[in-house]
From Swiss-Prot:
GO biological process: arginine biosynthetic process via ornithine; L-arginine biosynthetic process
HAMAP family named in the record: Arg_succ_lyase
Subcellular location: Cytoplasm
Family: Belongs to the lyase 1 family. Argininosuccinate lyase subfamily.
Organism: Campylobacter jejuni subsp. jejuni serotype O:6 (strain 81116 / NCTC 11828)
Reactions that this protein is recorded to catalyse: 2-(N(omega)-L-arginino)succinate = fumarate + L-arginine
Protein name: Argininosuccinate lyase
SUPFAM superfamilies linked: L-aspartase-like
């Protein structure tokens, strides 16, 4: 038992089963860089307060830099007996510079605030990485939007043909979803920008420390004002997990449509061979595995969010060992999100838009019906419900003839309320550009939407 850094109170040795069960080193060694960063900031603060001597600080920093180098070069020996990355680094530091100086590093600090600080630094870094990837994905969508303002396709409600739109308008809908994802991450990052370092176990310390200094060194905006909240808070992790879950809600919807649109039934897009796979038995198959995997991984990141919510539910203040389970799911979600956004962006850059197939699909499902109803209201002063009924009859007549309403030669033969001007409406491009409301599918509106998004990402 005397090998453990907390063993002074114990007379008996820990069971080997407990040592293995209690250890988190295999998971939290991911935080080695943040742990060393936090320790250097803490030691620097201790020296500024007269708690450490200058030569002790220099030795600690030099020793920690050696530990970092050993880990990065794969020379560091991880031992599960060290329990976690924090103890592993501290033990190795004491081996390098001696326990007389190495043992002073943990003055005015608990593993509780140390862990919270390391974890929060990782979360902040992850926010910034995800913001960059989302920005790049929006830029790819904008490139498609600029090219395809006149590429007409059907929109859908209930997966039934609805109204004609442009591919530009369609892809911009997803770009605006990602814009909200960015804003959500920015808000979460702002809430996470408070340092718990110096909170100690839960009640602060009797040393005259300077928490603001260590927070400043680590790049935090301020300190957590309550030490008990500082060590027990995991909102920052929940916020990131939620933000990632919403990102996957959006990307899984896009991926589902890419799967549908690349199928033989639609053939709206062609996914590059570089991002498709084949079948082990069917030679003709070209499978959209990237999209299917992202769709599947959505359940995984949802699960990680629910897991941490459940872990934190009803935990008494302040720190509890349950909270050791907070990291694995978050590490997994962050990696999953980064990998997915990178490959989704690469795939979208190379998709081929099949314009003719999209336009031909508009000739099914009577996409111009709403335009006709609006015309009757606007030009003939007919109440909308009556106009709806009249156009419904036009649709029924067209279906009886086995044609789409866009193929009708003379609307007045179906109902005399229609004149020659109404025939001008049976044109998909006219329908697209007849929309006058803000945020509509017209080219003028689409260009404004592109400007909004370009202005947004330029200011990131």
């Amino acid at each position: 038992m005397k090998n453990e850094m907390w063993s002074g109170r114990f007379s008996g040795a820990s069971d080997e089963l407990l040592k293995e069960f209690n250890a988190s080193l295999n998971v939290d060694k991911t935080l080695f860089n943040e742990d060393i960063q936090g320790s250097i900031a803490h030691a620097t603060m201790l020296e500024s307060c007269g708690i450490l001597k200058k030569e002790e600080l220099d030795a600690i920093i030099k020793g920690l830099e050696q530990v970092k180098s050993e880990i990065e070069q794969g020379k560091f020996v991880f031992d599960i007996k060290d329990e976690d990355i924090h103890m592993a680094i501290e033990k190795r530091l004491s081996e390098i510079i001696g326990s007389e100086i190495g043992g002073r590093l943990h003055t005015a600090r608990s593993r509780n605030d140390q862990v919270a600080t390391d974890f929060k630094l990782f979360v902040k870094k992850s926010h910034i990485e995800l913001l960059k990837l989302l920005k790049e994905l929006i830029q790819t969508m904008l490139e498609h939007a600029k090219v395809h303002k006149k590429t007409i396709m059907p929109s859908f409600t209930h997966l039934q043909h609805a109204q004609p739109v442009s591919f530009s308008f369609y892809i911009l809908a997803y770009a605006f979803m990602l814009m909200r994802d960015i804003k959500r991450l920015q808000n979460s990052l702002e809430l996470a920008d408070f340092s718990p370092l110096g909170s100690c176990a839960c009640a602060g310390t009797s040393y005259a420390t300077n928490r603001e200094l260590s927070a400043e060194i680590l790049g935090f905006k301020d300190i957590m004002p309550n030490a008990m909240d500082g060590v027990s808070d995991r909102d920052f992790a929940l916020d990131l997990l939620y933000d990632i879950a919403v990102i996957f809600t959006h990307t899984s919807r896009l991926c589902e449509e890419m799967i549908l649109f690349s199928s033989s039934e639609f053939s709206f897009i062609t996914i590059s061979d570089s991002f498709s796979t084949g079948s082990s038995i069917m030679p003709q198959k070209k499978n959209p595995d990237v999209c299917e995997l992202i769709r599947g991984k959505t359940g995984r990141v949802y699960g990680n969010l629910i897991s941490l919510l459940t872990i934190m539910k009803a935990l008494p203040l302040a720190y509890n060992k349950d909270m050791q389970e907070d990291k694995e799911g978050l590490f997994d979600s962050v990696k999953t999100a980064k990998d997915s956004l990178i490959i989704l962006n690469a795939m979208l850059k190379e998709i081929q838009i099949n314009k003719e197939n999209m336009l031909n699909a508009c000739k099914k499902g009577h996409l111009l019906a709403t335009d006709l109803a609006d015309y009757l209201v606007r030009e003939k002063n007919i109440p909308f419900r009556k106009a709806h009924f009249i156009v419904g009859n036009v649709v029924a007549q067209a279906e009886a003839q086995g044609i789409d309403i866009s193929e009708i030669k003379d609307l007045s033969k179906i109902d005399p309320v229609f004149d020659e001007k109404a025939m001008e409406l049976l044109n998909f491009e006219f329908s697209l550009n007849s929309k006058q409301s803000e945020g509509s599918s017209s080219i003028a509106s689409v260009e404004k939407q592109i400007q909004i998004l370009e202005g947004f990402i330029q200011n990131l």
